[in-house]
Amino acid sequence: MQYTEVMVRYGELSTKGKNRKDFIGRLAGNVTRALQDFPEIEIHPKHDRMHIVLNGAPFETIDQRLKLVFGIQTYSPTIKVDKNLDAIKKASLELMQATFKDGMTFKVNTRRSDHDFEYDTNQLNMMIGDYLFDNMDNLKVQMKKPDLVLRIEVRQDAIYISNQLLHGAGGMPVGTAGKAVMMLSGGIDSPVASYLAMKRGVEIDMVHFFSPPYTTEKALAKAKELTGILANYSGKINFIAVPFTEIQEQIKEKLPEGYLMTIQRRFMLQLADRIRAMRGGLAIFNGESVGQVASQTLESMVAINDVTSTPVLRPVATMDKTEIIKLAEQIGTFDLSIEPFEDCCTIFAPPRPKTKPKLDEARKLEDRLDAEGMIQRAIDGMEITPIYPNQKFLDDKAQEDADLL
């Protein structure tokens, strides 16, 4: 079926009042970026919906891209025809023949914004319905929840016909809620938290801590490749690799075992906050889920959050692990997340970490270290890499090695 355009309906933009124009502009920019390798396409954002004129571009490919753009509630592949009855009949029949399967029910639903058109909605519903019955077999009308709804929209410029209502990613356009940093490990939770942050319109920079020689280049490549998967939802994500070896070695050498995890996380949060300020971010996101591990008890969060007044947001905080895994599978990060490359969150992990660390004790222990010096050296050593959708960093040999572990 050769569609002429795609009609996009906005998600929560309708709730944004005076900022609506800016939100629609941001969404149009994000759609343009997602479809940038189709120069023939024209994108026309309007107050109530967006029209994507295909000009011969294949809808099947466009469909896969639009599913990944936050801010789109629903969209429909559409045929645009002249405002005459014969053109409406012809396009309606072609569309139904291309999508109808035996046993399906249908109805015709007409809307008019051009009230000067010669037929009203009831007349069009009846005439097009009768025409379809005369030219197709096994049709069955059902007014409530039919399998197919043939939608006819009579507008000032033309008539638009569709019979599919496809669901988009929902949420808000990335970039409309400001900028933040995301503390990305190589595990399951933080990529899911990243996805949920972007779904709320947040533009994120990834902050990843690595500790060579204890962590390998493969672990770093894995985190970058996870970022490449997530970049499908935003177009590009800056990946900030922060060296963490010195800090981990000093903590292990000088502090009691039970507080290693707490102090490590305090340093990570301080570094993330410094980077946030440097990058113009407003918040810090992470993948913590309440009670999942020792560093994620409420007592631990109090002892760790003490180092910053910046909002620390945890999108998966109340989700069960099974819920997080299900979403990771849905967004395509799960298989890579479970590849067994050790990251800095697992090295030096004490066998009996404190689950209820004391804030005063954490502060005293941290004071034994050259905190400011180590933080500054880590900042000086960080590397920023722009990462694009589906960019690869793990070679085939690395994947084979992971499969053997």
From Swiss-Prot:
<dbReference type="GO" id="GO:0005829">
    <property type="term" value="C:cytosol"/>
</dbReference>
<keyword id="KW-0784">Thiamine biosynthesis</keyword>
<dbReference type="GO" id="GO:0000049">
    <property type="term" value="F:tRNA binding"/>
</dbReference>
<dbReference type="InterPro" id="IPR020536">
    <property type="entry name" value="ThiI_AANH"/>
</dbReference>
<feature type="domain" description="THUMP">
    <location>
        <begin position="60"/>
        <end position="165"/>
    </location>
</feature>
<feature type="binding site">
    <location>
        <begin position="183"/>
        <end position="184"/>
    </location>
    <ligand>
        <name>ATP</name>
    </ligand>
</feature>
<dbReference type="Pfam" id="PF22025">
    <property type="entry name" value="ThiI_fer"/>
</dbReference>
<dbReference type="InterPro" id="IPR004114">
    <property type="entry name" value="THUMP_dom"/>
</dbReference>
<dbReference type="GO" id="GO:0140741">
    <property type="term" value="F:tRNA-uracil-4 sulfurtransferase activity"/>
</dbReference>
<keyword id="KW-0547">Nucleotide-binding</keyword>
<feature type="binding site">
    <location>
        <position position="265"/>
    </location>
    <ligand>
        <name>ATP</name>
    </ligand>
</feature>
<keyword id="KW-0820">tRNA-binding</keyword>
<dbReference type="GO" id="GO:0052837">
    <property type="term" value="P:thiazole biosynthetic process"/>
</dbReference>
<dbReference type="InterPro" id="IPR049961">
    <property type="entry name" value="ThiI_N"/>
</dbReference>
<dbReference type="GO" id="GO:0009229">
    <property type="term" value="P:thiamine diphosphate biosynthetic process"/>
</dbReference>
<dbReference type="InterPro" id="IPR003720">
    <property type="entry name" value="tRNA_STrfase"/>
</dbReference>
<comment type="function">
    <text>Catalyzes the ATP-dependent transfer of a sulfur to tRNA to produce 4-thiouridine in position 8 of tRNAs, which functions as a near-UV photosensor. Also catalyzes the transfer of sulfur to the sulfur carrier protein ThiS, forming ThiS-thiocarboxylate. This is a step in the synthesis of thiazole, in the thiamine biosynthesis pathway. The sulfur is donated as persulfide by IscS.</text>
</comment>
<comment type="similarity">
    <text>Belongs to the ThiI family.</text>
</comment>
<dbReference type="Pfam" id="PF02568">
    <property type="entry name" value="ThiI"/>
</dbReference>
<dbReference type="GO" id="GO:0002937">
    <property type="term" value="P:tRNA 4-thiouridine biosynthesis"/>
</dbReference>
<dbReference type="Pfam" id="PF02926">
    <property type="entry name" value="THUMP"/>
</dbReference>
<keyword id="KW-0963">Cytoplasm</keyword>
<dbReference type="InterPro" id="IPR014729">
    <property type="entry name" value="Rossmann-like_a/b/a_fold"/>
</dbReference>
<keyword id="KW-0067">ATP-binding</keyword>
<feature type="binding site">
    <location>
        <begin position="208"/>
        <end position="209"/>
    </location>
    <ligand>
        <name>ATP</name>
    </ligand>
</feature>
<comment type="pathway">
    <text>Cofactor biosynthesis; thiamine diphosphate biosynthesis.</text>
</comment>
<feature type="binding site">
    <location>
        <position position="287"/>
    </location>
    <ligand>
        <name>ATP</name>
    </ligand>
</feature>
<dbReference type="GO" id="GO:0005524">
    <property type="term" value="F:ATP binding"/>
</dbReference>
<keyword id="KW-0694">RNA-binding</keyword>
<dbReference type="InterPro" id="IPR049962">
    <property type="entry name" value="THUMP_ThiI"/>
</dbReference>
<feature type="binding site">
    <location>
        <position position="296"/>
    </location>
    <ligand>
        <name>ATP</name>
    </ligand>
</feature>
<protein>
    <recommendedName>
        <fullName>Probable tRNA sulfurtransferase</fullName>
        <ecNumber>2.8.1.4</ecNumber>
    </recommendedName>
</protein>
<dbReference type="GO" id="GO:0004810">
    <property type="term" value="F:CCA tRNA nucleotidyltransferase activity"/>
</dbReference>
<dbReference type="InterPro" id="IPR054173">
    <property type="entry name" value="ThiI_fer"/>
</dbReference>
<keyword id="KW-0808">Transferase</keyword>
<dbReference type="InterPro" id="IPR050102">
    <property type="entry name" value="tRNA_sulfurtransferase_ThiI"/>
</dbReference>
<dbReference type="GO" id="GO:0009228">
    <property type="term" value="P:thiamine biosynthetic process"/>
</dbReference>
